[in-house]
Amino acid sequence: MSSMPKQTDVILIGAGVMSATLGVLLKELAPDMKIKVFEKLASAGEESSNEWNNAGTGHAALCELNYTTENADGTIDISKAVKVNEQFQLSRQFWSHLVKEQVLPNPKEFIMPIPHMSMVEGAENVTFLKKRLEALSANPLFKGMEFSEDPEQLKEWIPLIMEGRTSPEPIAATKIDSGTDVNFGALTRILFDHLKQLDVEINYGHGVEDLKRVDGGWEIKVKNERDNRIEHHTAKFVFIGGGGGSLPLLQKTGIPESKQIGGFPVSGLFLVCKNPEIAERHHAKVYGKAKVGAPPMSVPHLDTRYIDGQKSLLFGPFAGFSPKFLKTGSNLDLITSVKPNNVLTMLAAGAKEMGLTKYLIEQVLLSTEQRMNELREFIPNAKTEDWDVVVAGQRVQVIKDTPQGKGALQFGTEVVSAADGSVAALLGASPGASTAVPVMLEVLAKCFPDQLPSWEAKIKEMIPSYGTSLVANPELFDQIHAETTKTLELTEAQPIR
């Protein structure tokens, strides 16, 4: 049975961190705006935003080596690292504003201070890490980064990693204490509780099946999973924030911007330590370097995590393959996403990305002991009985045509929107949730251009560096970073036991 369309101003599809962030921004800027949220699952933050479905790194390019690449002349390109760091500063500022407003009353529920480290082995990699440090140290956003190749110093920083290490290869690491671990699941749930108090209509157990243009906006077809009833809702603006499920819904809009875009799903696996004594001996997020020929998504890291108030230790990611675009998706997701307008894009990517294909096949075939051997490159004394495999979330790597050619694999997070700004979708993977605030500000700029000028003063009140380069204003960065560190309670360094 179908009902008459019910009207509203804004519809948010998916109850993840992106929709939560956009919803809170809109209610701060336009309190009278009528917003509806539709989520297929039973609660908020259960797919990509869930704390067990992502690495929880506050991505600020402090330790992730794939954001700093070496040019042919040996110099280090830090432009991507600077962009990612600037983006994370915007997220920190907005979260700080919400802490002051008591929307996020206890910062420790969703963000914790943790050193971010990069670690490499081998003379060539040590040279690269030194050059990276020199390039980043000249930038105010990366102040306080230390470098060491002294084994005694490294034993203090990362005792678990150095214990039992017998390799003759030189080893080096950088360390910066201003890193964070973010529980995006907890953050998402708190923000949706707040939106509910602001009279946002949140519909769990409601899966969006179709979108079509109507006068003045979009009509969406929704299946109420609880009573198997079809509903129709209309809105002037629709945001598709459904994680891996965003691409199929974007395709249903039929907008020109949705053409020549495909997606390839990659599932993630982590090893989680079940021995609390071992987890207590490590206190950092330590990122290594992807092996030659491996894609950026394969960067191995050993992470201290704070989940449900408990300190955990995870290692990964390992890639798996599933044709599903969501952990709770369908095995038909991949095949049904191939359309006449993107089949050549997908085929071109398949031909170009043989390295990725080889990597995925090798990863899928790994045994538990082979995964443990990869962990032992970080923790030489790791015992199989102390670790379990956990399945993390699905990532859909975007494939699209670019001026450089067909079928280019995209790494990053991007907004695809209609020319008239009436619909926008969030696609991509890392840095993902860390960039929720800057990416949703981009949605506001693209989709609410008429209202934006009148909103800018309020945005700057919430996010003081909005529209300003922090790199070009180091004094402003120092001031804002100190303020957000204090407000978010990120000053307590915890010793390694």
Curated annotation (Swiss-Prot):
Reaction catalysed by this enzyme: (S)-malate + a quinone = a quinol + oxaloacetate
Molecular function in Gene Ontology: 2-hydroxyglutarate dehydrogenase activity; L-malate dehydrogenase (quinone) activity
GO BP term, example: tricarboxylic acid cycle
Enzyme Commission number, as recorded: 1.1.5.4
Key word Cell membrane present: no
Enzyme kind, highest EC tier: oxidoreductase
Disulphide linkage map: none
Cofactor(s) named in the record: FAD
Pathways per UniProt: Carbohydrate metabolism; tricarboxylic acid cycle; oxaloacetate from (S)-malate (quinone route): step 1/1
Keywords: FAD, Flavoprotein, Oxidoreductase, Tricarboxylic acid cycle
Keyword match Zinc: no
Record family assignment: Belongs to the MQO family.
Name by which UniProt lists this protein: Probable malate:quinone oxidoreductase
Naturally occurring in which organism (per UniProt): Exiguobacterium sibiricum (strain DSM 17290 / CCUG 55495 / CIP 109462 / JCM 13490 / 255-15)
